[in-house]
Amino acid sequence: MRGSSLGLYFILPIASGFFFDFNQRNQHEGQQPQVSYEDKVLNNDCADFLCPDTLTCVKTAKDCPCPFPKSQLRCTLPNGQFVCISKPATHDKNLNAIYDDPVKGPQSKIKGLRDCGWVQDAYKGIV
């Protein structure tokens, strides 16, 4: 028992030193303080509509892009609002080309896949 306590006595300072040093290395010197979301919104020069998710300046809320357009579809709902969903995962190159197309992708309704057609059905209570 005494031997294990003695070993712990020597290892503890080394372990705590490692974690202390680890935290110090993760602090970047000369890094500018992060600007808060509120400051970004309040100090924005947008004269039209500022999209809340992306802080993109557009003419109307209907023109807001998805935060991750490479991996998301922008699905317009019947009430004019929109939701962003992940593009369906598929290994079919033809389907991927459709979903990557900014016009065809949001209009697609392929049975068995959760795309914008599925979102429309869910909105209407069909799913």
From Swiss-Prot:
Protein name as annotated: Long chronological lifespan protein 2
GO terms of biological process kind: ERAD pathway
Signal sequence, renumbered to the chain: 1-17
Keywords attached to this entry: Signal
Organism: Lachancea thermotolerans (strain ATCC 56472 / CBS 6340 / NRRL Y-8284) (Yeast)
Family indicated by similarity: Belongs to the LCL2 family.
Xref: InterPro entries: LCL2
Superkingdom as given in the UniProt entry: Eukaryota
CDD domains in alphabetical order: LCL2-like
Function noted in UniProt: Probable component of the endoplasmic reticulum-associated degradation (ERAD) pathway.
Gene that encodes it: LCL2
